[in-house]
Swiss-Prot record:
Cofactor(s) named in the record: heme b
Catalytic reactions on record: H2O2 + AH2 = A + 2 H2O; 2 H2O2 = O2 + 2 H2O
Site feature Transition state stabilizer, where: R94
HAMAP family xrefs: Catal_peroxid (MF_01961)
Protein name as it appears in the record: Catalase-peroxidase
EC number: 1.11.1.21
Native species: Gloeobacter violaceus (strain ATCC 29082 / PCC 7421)
GO cellular component terms, semicolon-separated: cytosol
Gene this protein is translated from: katG
Alphabetized Gene3D superfamilies for the sequence: 1.10.520.10, Peroxidase, domain 2
Complexes and interactors: Homodimer or homotetramer.
Cofactor note: Binds 1 heme b (iron(II)-protoporphyrin IX) group per dimer.
Length: 735
């Protein structure tokens, strides 16, 4: 077949092989706004079907039986990939760590929550070399338990089982990670176009936000030191920044490094570039998803090549003990190189030369090794102080590592209410953003109607009520399930002081809502109460209803009580800081300049809110006419009847194409529309506003809401999207 002549998509050549390809819109127009991230992992791509309830399936699982199967598997060494020291535990710990360790607190992306280590690019990162073998070893477990046990849960459970099988007591395990079925395309892993590049740094080694890893394809830091330079103090700087961006403090960082490096070994039998083949995504079809084919010797066991470093940290690499710190502090270390040419450290002390068993040959012994990043635990004063305390107090290390490991492997799962299974700890941790349990009768329909009337009579505008509710609920991030209206943390530090929330106006609104709350609660005799969290959302719903009524629509915005109010003691201020919106297109707010366009940041915010492109579109149009802009700005308020729920934003934006001319103002991100005939200025808008008339896909959606018969459609769609955002964190409700 003549591919170029007969294929409607066109043809090309890759390494002499005919392939089909498509010149996508993205290739033709690289600056084209990408909305595809709002429609990832559609139901049609899920082989489990739309009615699949993973939580119910997992709860039916005999977790103890699963663990016994994993325990048995870990000590059954396979010839095709022999276990170091006869135990796959260290390999499974690395697999679980690297699955969870992609999490970053800046945008909540990454982590183990969707089983994405099995997809590109993660399955082919240099730092994940040979973890394809770990997942293949686990296939019999996955095959046996099927839909009851997701890959996301299995990877972390295997790590926990590995620790337990080697004598460590973990803090617990929770299931509930729902697998996705295609790679995540919303995650910016870095600007580099080659593995281990580090273009993510500006001057003074300032790491670009929201990245956490130091180089493309690494989970954390380069074990040889920054850019391969064996400088322990410089490595400490990278470690602190990287682990900090993954939500870990100094004590948690030391505990994780020491605890993880108590087990297993590094593999650097020979120079990788001479012997190691392509990663899984680049390997031949006959490799069946396996990569890093190694032609050195047997290619496995003693000949394994992974990181390039070679050796174990402790005398007993498959037993929990304090050997890591014993070796770190009792020996003096000097720089050397592994057989693969990687920088690492070896003891100066001759008595250390034969203290470590060989991973495969019982007749051989070795000296322990340390990476440059391990020596950072001794070189950096703060890390050294913590390390010596752990060395002197092994029980403190065990507790700190158990808690840090639990945090590492569960940080991206969101609130405690989402955790499943018999091994969930009895109490939530502060990093899970706990809220009090609801322990009182909830308000009923009559109470809701009365409270709505009181709120609307309290002297707060429709715009202020809408803005307050939006500010509270829209902190939610679908990535790590944090934020949202539950807890009413908008009244607490730091949220009450965020610039985007207009602190003075917010305080006034909250004071009036709190007065209504106090009066209502004081008047109850049967224990019934209403939380401020519920009142904030109810106020927004009442305002939307009032705005719709002004437009001639008698509607009821769905509202479900049951939110509670978190206390300052339940709120980690530092942990909440990354949730602050520095740019929010829904409120036409730009607090700081970004390397990304305002419209790109709008799409990013919409993705965090789990919105589709139609939902994003209808919310922007509705919020504009409701007056929910930051600071009461008129930018994008394309209506003569503000605080009225109309489709005027879309109607008037699309009319300007023929009757008006848009021009940039001195502020390049603000545009003004003037009458083509008279020159009279009519509207002003931002890039976020104009993108709905400029981008062909968003214009099509705008047209759908702008037609003469679309007003009811618009109102219904706005209410549905509004309700979705208000309830994003309501994991107590049926889904």
């Amino acid at each position: 077949m003549d591919v170029e002549a007969k294929c409607p998509m066109g043809g090309g050549k890759v390494e002499g092989r005919a392939v089909l390809f498509e010149m996508t819109n993205r290739l033709w127009w690289p600056n084209h706004l990408d909305l595809s991230v709002l429609h990832q992992n559609p139901p049609a791509g899920n082989p489990m079907g739309e009615g699949f309830n993973y939580a119910a399936e997992f709860e039916s699982l005999d977790l103890a039986a699963v663990k016994q199967d994993i325990f048995a598997l870990m000590t059954e060494s396979q010839d095709w990939w022999p276990a170091d020291y006869g135990h796959y535990g260290p390999l499974f710990i690395r697999m679980a760590w690297h699955a969870a360790g992609t999490y970053r607190i800046g945008d909540g992306r990454g982590g183990a929550g969707a089983g994405t280590q099995r997809f590109a690019p993660l399955n082919s990162w240099p730092d994940n070399a040979n973890l394809d073998k770990a997942r293949l070893l686990l296939w019999p477990i996955k095959e046996k338990y099927g839909r009851k046990l997701s890959w996301g849960d299995l990877l972390i459970l295997a790590g926990n089982c590995a620790l337990e099988s080697m004598g460590f007591k973990t803090a617990g395990f929770a299931g509930g990670r729902v697998d996705i079925w295609e790679p995540e395309n919303d995650i910016f892993w870095g600007p580099e176009r080659e593995w281990l590049g580090d273009e993510r740094y500006s001057s003074d080694r300032d790491l670009a936000h929201p990245l956490a890893a130091v180089q493309m394809g690494l989970i954390y830091v380069n074990p040889e030191g920054p850019n391969g330079k064996p400088d322990p103090m410089a490595a400490a700087h990278d470690i602190r920044e990287t682990f900090g961006r993954m939500a870990m403090n100094d004590e948690e960082t030391v505990a994780l490094i020491a605890g993880g490096h108590t087990f297993g070994k590094c593999h650097g039998a020979a120079e990788p570039s001479q012997y190691v083949g392509a990663e899984p995504e680049g390997a031949g079809i006959e490799r069946q998803g396996l990569g890093w084919d190694n032609s050195f010797g047997s290619g496995r066991g003693v000949h394994t090549i992974t990181s390039g470093l070679e050796g174990a940290w402790t005398k007993n690499p498959i037993q929990w003990d304090n050997g890591y710190f014993e070796n770190l502090f009792e020996y003096e270390w000097e720089l050397t190189k592994s057989p693969a040419g990687a920088h690492q450290w070896t003891p100066k002390n001759p008595e250390a030369a034969s203290t470590v068993p060989d991973a495969h040959d019982p007749h051989k012994r070795h000296a322990p090794m340390m990476a440059t990043t391990d020596l950072a635990m001794r070189a950096d004063p703060a890390y050294e102080k913590i390390s010596r305390r752990f060395y002197d107090n092994p029980d403190q290390l065990a507790h700190a590592f158990a808690e840090a490991w639990y945090k590492l492997t569960h940080r991206d799962m969101g609130p405690y209410a989402r955790l499943l299974g018999p091994e969930v700890p009895s109490e939530p941790r502060i990093w899970q953003d706990p809220v009090p349990a609801s322990d009182h009768p909830l308000i009923d329909d009559a109470d809701i109607a009365e409270l709505k009337a009181q709120i609307l009579a309290a002297g707060l505008s429709i715009a202020r009520l809408v803005t307050t509710a939006w500010a509270s609920a829209s902190t939610f991030r679908g990535t790590d399930k944090r934020g949202g209206a539950n807890g009413a943390r908008i009244r607490l530090v730091p949220q009450k002081d965020w610039a985007v929330n207009e602190p003075t106006e917010l305080a006034t609104a909250l004071a009036k809502l709190e007065a209504i709350q106090q009066d209502f609660n004081a008047g109850q005799t049967g224990g019934k109460q209403v939380s401020l969290a519920d009142l904030i959302v109810l106020g927004g719903c009442a305002a939307v209803e009032q705005a719709a009524k002004k437009a001639g629509h008698d509607i009821t915005v769905p509202f479900t009580p049951g939110r509670t109010d978190a206390s300052p003691d339940q709120t980690d201020v530092e942990s909440f800081a990354p949730l602050e919106p520095k740019i929010d297109g829904f409120r036409n707010y730009v607090g700081e300049k970004s390397v990304y366009s305002a419209e790109e940041m709008l799409v990013d915010r919409a993705h965090l809110l789990t919105l589709s492109a139609p939902e994003m579109t209808v919310l922007v149009g509705g919020l504009r006419v409701l007056g929910a802009n930051y600071g009461g700005s008129k930018l994008g308020v394309f209506t003569e009847r503000p605080e009225t729920l109309t489709n005027d934003f879309f109607v008037n934006l699309l009319k300007t194409s023929t009757s008006m001319k848009w021009e940039a103002s001195p502020d390049a991100d603000v545009f003004e529309a003037s009458d083509r005939a008279t020159g009279e200025k009519k509207w002003a808008g931002t890039r976020v506003d104009l993108i709905f008339g400029s981008n062909s896909q968003l214009r099509a959606l705008s047209e759908a809401y702008a037609t003469a018969d679309a007003q009811q459609t618009f109102v219904d769609a706005f209410v549905a999207a509004w309700t979705k955002v208000m309830n994003l964190d309501r994991f107590d409700l049926p889904r």
